[in-house]
C-alpha cells in the first residue's frame, strides 16, 4: 500500500510565538528547521514519499533542500484547507496518507512501523496530542473531512464514525508531545537523545531539572 506523509508547516517568521520569551525569532526558526529534519527523517524510512505543504517560500526552499516533495498552498487557506489540498494532490498516486505536524520531534522514538500496521486493521488511525488535539492521522485521501484544531482528537473520531469508518487510537507519549512551551523544550532535552532538536537546544546551552514550582520541569539557559 503506497503511503505519503503530509507535513504542514507554518511560516518560519510566524510560528511558535509562545516560545518568544525563551527563544529569539532566529532561534525559533532554527528549532523549527531541526524539528522538520526529525519528523521528515523518521517518516521517510517508512513511507513512499514525504510531502511538505506551506505558504512560506522559505519553508518550501528548506524542505526541498532536505530532499522532500514540496507543495505551495493555493490562496489563503486554514490548516484544514491546506491539508485537503495536499490530500487531493496525493490521491491519484497514493492509497493512504499520514498527516503529522512538524513540531513532534520525538516521533522517531515512537514505533512508526507499528503505527502504520494499525492502519492495515482500521480505516482511520489517530494519535492524540496533549490537550485533546491530533498529532497523527492516517487515512485514505479524502476519506473524511479534517477537523484539526482545538479538541480535534474527539472531532476526528466523531467524523470517522459518522462516515462508518473504523477507528484505531494509537496512544504514544512520543507522538503526543508537540512543542509550544519552555517545558516542552525540557521534554526534548530529557527524551530526545539522537534528535536534531535536542542537539540544537544543547548548542543553545539549555538545561533541564525537576521543578519545585507549578511546572514539572525547570528549563534554564547557561550564560
Curated annotation (Swiss-Prot):
Subunit structure: Homodimer.
Similarity section: Belongs to the CofC family.
Catalytic reaction annotation: (2S)-2-phospholactate + GTP + H(+) = (2S)-lactyl-2-diphospho-5'-guanosine + diphosphate
Protein's job: Guanylyltransferase that catalyzes the activation of (2S)-2-phospholactate (2-PL) as (2S)-lactyl-2-diphospho-5'-guanosine, via the condensation of 2-PL with GTP. It is involved in the biosynthesis of coenzyme F420, a hydride carrier cofactor.
Protein name: 2-phospho-L-lactate guanylyltransferase
Provenance organism: Methanothermobacter thermautotrophicus (strain ATCC 29096 / DSM 1053 / JCM 10044 / NBRC 100330 / Delta H)
PANTHER family associated with the record: 2-PHOSPHO-L-LACTATE GUANYLYLTRANSFERASE
Gene3D superfamilies assigned: 6.10.140.50, Spore Coat Polysaccharide Biosynthesis Protein SpsA, Chain A (3.90.550.10)
Family matches, as InterPro entries: CofC, Nucleotide-diphossugar_trans
Gene Ontology molecular functions: GTP binding; phospholactate guanylyltransferase activity
GO biological process: F420-0 metabolic process
Pathway(s): Cofactor biosynthesis; coenzyme F420 biosynthesis
EC nos: 2.7.7.68
UniProt KW keywords: GTP-binding, Nucleotide-binding, Nucleotidyltransferase, Transferase
Amino acid at each position: 500500500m503506497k503511503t505519503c506523509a503530509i507535513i504542514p508547516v507554518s511560516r518560519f517568521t510566524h510560528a511558535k510565538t509562545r516560545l518568544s520569551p525563551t527563544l529569539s525569532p532566529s532561534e525559533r526558526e532554527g528549532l523549527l528547521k531541526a524539528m522538520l529534519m526529525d519528523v521528515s527523517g523518521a517518516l521517510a524510512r517508512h513511507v513512499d514519499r514525504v510531502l511538505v505543504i506551506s505558504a512560506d517560500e522559505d519553508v518550501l526552499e528548506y524542505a526541498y533542500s532536505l530532499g522532500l516533495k514540496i507543495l505551495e498552498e493555493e490562496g489563503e487557506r486554514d490548516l484544514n484547507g491546506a491539508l485537503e489540498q495536499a490530500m487531493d494532490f496525493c490521491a491519484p498516486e497514493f492509497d493512504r496518507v499520514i498527516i503529522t505536524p512538524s513540531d513532534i520531534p520525538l516521533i522517531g522514538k515512537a514505533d512508526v512501523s507499528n503505527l502504520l500496521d494499525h492502519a492495515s486493521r482500521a480505516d482511520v488511525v489517530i494519535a492524540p496530542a496533549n490537550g485533546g488535539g491530533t498529532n497523527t492521522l492516517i487515512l485514505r485521501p479524502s476519506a473524511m473531512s479534517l477537523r484539526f484544531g482545538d479538541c480535534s482528537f474527539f472531532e476526528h473520531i466523531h467524523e470517522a464514525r459518522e462516515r462508518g469508518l473504523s477507528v484505531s487510537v494509537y496512544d504514544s507519549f512520543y507522538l503526543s508531545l508537540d512543542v509550544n512551551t519552555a517545558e516542552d523544550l525540557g521534554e526534548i532535552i530529557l527524551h530526545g537523545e539522537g534528535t536534531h532538536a535536542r542537539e540544537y537546544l544543547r548548542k543553545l546551552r539549555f538545561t533541564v531539572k525537576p521543578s519545585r514550582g507549578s511546572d514539572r520541569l525547570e528549563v534554564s539557559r547557561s550564560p
